[in-house]
Amino acid sequence: MIIFEKQTDVKTYLKPFLQDQKTIGFVPTMGALHQGHLSLMKESLQNNDHTVVSIFVNPTQFNNPEDLKKYPRTLESDVEKIKLLNHKIIIYAPTVEDIYEGKTASKSFDYDGLELQMEGKHRPGHFDGVGTIVKKLFEIVNPTHAYFGEKDFQQLAIVRKLVQKNKINTKIVGCKILREANQLAMSSRNERLTADERTKAAMIYNTLAEAKKLFGTKSANEVTKWVTKTFENQSMFELEYFEITDEQTLLTCKRKNKNKKYRAFIAVFVNNIKLIDNISLK
């Protein structure tokens, strides 16, 4: 199994593959790997000659220093999981110094307003951090395809916009959300929940599923009010936002249009641990 820590080494290693026009699939992660991440890797393995996985907790996308401090760092077990899946996967696990070269700061990006909604509204600067690291990693790896999960649907839309605006020659592949047995969306943050919280967090997806049913006959505003009311009586959960948006622009749905696709997004705090999820409303 090959593990690189320096960008110069990974670039040198991948260069002959690029010269031979081999396809390179790329799965960028922040570690604390779960089955959702592994499903992205499987997708890449099936569709590319080589697969690269990066493991890097990116400081510039955390607007809360406490969240960055508490984010799980489990490099050894992450490497074991990847090895069990396929020992030919190339791992790039850089240091902050290697990536940012002494300047740990974000660049500013314009994503045509995608960054102003939901996560962008509640986490100022977050998507500048995401854009900065994704662009840097793409420049290092030069992937043919890059794989992102739909759980972070807004991030997926933003990465697509980043690639389009910067004319990056990488195809972005969105992969379906993997869920636990109780339908809670798989997330590295789930590891910080107690067993009881993890069980009861099934309510998040159940609420989305019910909202989808209601959206068939009710307006977006009525569904949003119902979701807000549902969470008012829940002491364990604090609703940060629930939004029904146009799937393309991520703008809030004011009035339904049968020619558009809509998606519902939710963010909930469980004992200061933020969980997000979304569902297609078609």
Swiss-Prot record:
Cysteine pairs bridged by disulfides in the record: none
Pathway: Cofactor biosynthesis; (R)-pantothenate biosynthesis; (R)-pantothenate from (R)-pantoate and beta-alanine: step 1/1
GO annotation, biological process: pantothenate biosynthetic process
Any Pfam family hit: Pantoate_ligase
Catalytic activity: (R)-pantoate + beta-alanine + ATP = (R)-pantothenate + AMP + diphosphate + H(+)
Keywords: ATP-binding, Cytoplasm, Ligase, Nucleotide-binding, Pantothenate biosynthesis
Keyword Nucleotide-binding attributed: yes
Keyword Zinc (UniProt): no
Location (main, coarse): cytoplasm
Subcellular location, record wording: Cytoplasm
Binding site for (R)-pantoate: 61, 155
Function noted in UniProt: Catalyzes the condensation of pantoate with beta-alanine in an ATP-dependent reaction via a pantoyl-adenylate intermediate.
Subunit structure of this chain's protein: Homodimer.
Extra information: The reaction proceeds by a bi uni uni bi ping pong mechanism.
Designated name of the protein: Pantothenate synthetase
